[in-house]
From Swiss-Prot:
Alphabetical list of InterPro entries matching this protein: FAD/NAD-bd_sf, FAD/NAD-binding_dom, NADH-Q_oxidoreductase
Species this protein is from: Escherichia coli (strain K12)
Protein name (database record): Type II NADH:quinone oxidoreductase
Residues the record lists as binding FAD: 12-16, 42, 84, 124, 315, 331
Catalytic activity: a quinone + NADH + H(+) = a quinol + NAD(+); a ubiquinone + NADH + H(+) = a ubiquinol + NAD(+); ubiquinone-8 + NADH + H(+) = ubiquinol-8 + NAD(+); 2 Cu(2+) + NADH = 2 Cu(+) + NAD(+) + H(+)
Localisation: Cell inner membrane
Cofactor(s) listed: FAD
Length: 434
C-alpha cells in the first residue's frame, strides 16, 4: 500500500516563503517525497525592499516581478492564488477566501487545503497606530499595487507643476517614518525629479520639490548604529530633504499632517512608512498565540507555541532571542528563518532533533538612490561593526538582491537576468514614465 505524500503548505510568497517553497520543491517536490504548495493572494513576487524604487519609477516591476505559477512549475511545487481566512488545526486544513473579478463575478469559490505541516510566512504591513486620517489620506508601501498608485500620483503632481511652470508653488511630499523605506524613498524622489527634468518636464528641478521626512524617534534609521543614521541624515540634508526627528504625527487630512508640537506640514502627497505589524486577520487565528502587533509567537525552533505542526517565519513571527529581545523584522532574518524552518521540517520528517534558530546580524545597508549608499557590515572579519559607504556599499547593497535571486533561480539564470538588466538600462528610459 502506497504511503500518502506529506503535505507541506506555505502561506505567503515573500522573500522567506518563496525561497522556502523553492528549496523544498527541489529537495522533496521533484522527488515525489512530499507535496509542496505555496499560497499567496498575488500573482507575482517582487522583493519588498525594491518597492520604493517601483514607487518613484526607477524600477519597472514588469522586468523584476516573478510569476508564482511559472516558478512553481519550474521548481517542483504547486501554487494556489488566494487569501487565507482561517486555520482548522483539528482537521489540519486552511480556508482560502473566494476569488472575484473587478466586476464582482465569482471566479473561484471558497476552498480548503489540507496540510501536515503549515508554514506562515505572511510578512508585515505598515502600522498606522490608529492615527486619525492616515488610512484615508496617506499611501502605504506594502505591495506593488500601492507603489504603482504612489507612482501615478507622483507623476500627475509633477506634470501639473511642469504645465503651470510652478505657478502653484512647490510640490510638497511628506513621508512619515524614518526607517529604511522612508529614507530611501526621500532620496529616490530627488533622483526622479532629476530624470523627469531630462525627459522634458519644464521647470522641474530639486528646488521645485519639497520633501519632509518625519520620524518620531531621536534619529532616523533607529535600528542602525548612530553613525550610519548621522551619515544618512547628512546626505538627505544635502539633497534638500527636511528631516524632522522627535516629531509625532497626531492626525492627517487632505492637505497635510498635524504634529504633536502643533505644526501643520502641508503635503500634496503623503506616505506612511512608520512601524510594522503582521496582517490583522492573523490575530488569534486558529487559536494560535499572537502578540499585540498580530505576530505569531514561536518557539526558538520557529514552531508556533500552541502547535508544533505550524511554523511561522519572517515579519509575521515573534521569535525571542537568547540574549533578550526579539528577532528584528528584516529581510536577512526572513532568509535565515526560511533555511532554519526548512531544515527543521526535514528533521521532523526523519525523526531527528530540531535546532533552535539563531539570528545572525550581517549588517545593514541603505541606498540613497544614485547619490550615495551607507551601511555597516558585521562579521568575523570585522570583529564588530564596520561602516561602509560609496561604491563599495552600493555594490554590497545590490549583492543582497542578487543573493535573493540566486536562492530562487540559481547562479546561471541569475547571471542571465543581470545581463538582461544591463541591456534594459541601455534601451529603456531611466525612469518609468507612465
Amino acid at each position: 500500500m502506497t504511503t500518502p505524500l506529506k503535505k507541506i503548505v506555505i502561506v505567503g510568497g515573500g522573500a522567506g516563503g518563496l525561497e522556502m517553497a523553492t528549496q523544498l520543491g527541489h529537495k522533496l517536490g521533484r522527488k515525489k517525497k512530499a507535496k509542496i504548495t505555496l499560497v499567496d493572494r498575488n500573482h507575482s513576487h517582487l522583493w519588498k525592499p525594491l518597492l520604493h524604487e517601483v514607487a518613484t519609477g526607477s524600477l519597472d516591476e514588469g522586468v523584476d516581478a516573478l510569476s508564482y505559477l511559472a516558478h512553481a512549475r519550474n521548481h517542483g511545487f504547486q501554487f494556489q492564488l488566494g487569501s487565507v481566512i482561517d486555520i482548522d488545526r483539528e482537521a489540519k486544513t486552511i480556508t482560502i477566501a473566494e476569488l472575484r473579478d473587478e466586476k464582482g463575478e465569482l471566479l473561484v469559490p471558497e476552498r480548503k487545503i489540507a496540510y501536515d505541516t503549515l508554514v506562515m510566512a505572511l510578512g508585515s504591513t505598515s502600522n498606522d497606530f490608529n492615527t486619525p486620517g492616515v488610512k484615508e489620506n496617506c499611501i502605504f508601501l506594502d505591495n506593488p499595487h500601492q507603489a504603482r498608485r504612489f507612482h501615478q500620483e507622483m507623476l500627475n503632481l509633477f506634470l501639473k507643476y511642469s504645465a503651470n511652470l510652478g505657478a502653484n508653488g512647490k510640490v510638497n511630499i511628506a513621508i512619515v517614518g524614518g526607517g529604511a523605506t522612508g529614507v530611501e524613498l526621500s532620496a529616490e524622489l530627488h533622483n526622479a525629479v532629476k530624470q523627469l527634468h531630462s525627459y522634458g518636464y519644464k521647470g522641474l528641478t530639486n528646488e521645485a520639490l519639497n520633501v519632509t521626512l518625519v520620524e518620531a524617534g531621536e534619529r532616523i534609521l533607529p535600528a542602525l548604529p548612530p553613525r550610519i543614521s548621522a551619515a544618512a541624515h547628512n546626505e538627505l540634508t544635502k539633497l534638500g530633504v527636511r528631516v524632522l526627528t522627535q516629531t509625532m504625527v497626531t492626525s492627517a487630512d487632505e492637505g497635510g499632517l498635524h504634529t504633536k508640537d502643533g505644526e501643520y506640514i502641508e503635503a500634496d502627497l503623503m506616505v506612511w512608512a512608520a512601524g510594522i505589524k503582521a496582517p490583522d486577520f492573523l490575530k488569534d487565528i486558529g487559536g494560535l498565540e499572537t502578540n499585540r502587533i498580530n505576530q505569531l509567537v514561536v518557539e526558538p525552533t520557529l514552531q508556533t507555541t500552541r502547535d508544533p505542526d505550524i511554523y511561522a517565519i519572517g515579519d509575521c513571527a515573534s521569535c525571542p532571542r537568547p540574549e533578550g529581545g526579539f528577532v528584528p523584522p528584516r529581510a536577512q532574518a526572513a532568509h535565515q528563518m526560511a533555511t532554519c524552518a526548512m531544515n527543521n521540517i526535514l528533521a521532523q520528517m526523519n525523526g531527528k532533533p530540531l535546532k533552535n534558530y539563531q539570528y545572525k546580524d550581517h549588517g545593514s545597508l541603505v541606498s540613497l538612490s544614485n547619490f550615495s549608499t551607507v551601511g555597516s557590515l558585521m562579521g568575523n572579519l570585522t570583529r564588530g561593526s564596520m561602516m561602509i559607504e560609496g561604491r563599495i556599499a552600493r555594490f554590497v547593497y545590490i549583492s543582497l538582491y542578487r543573493m535573493h535571486q540566486i536562492a530562487l533561480h540559481g547562479y546561471f539564470k541569475t547571471g542571465l537576468m543581470m545581463l538582461v538588466g544591463s541591456i534594459n538600462r541601455v534601451i529603456r528610459p531611466r525612469l518609468k514614465l507612465h
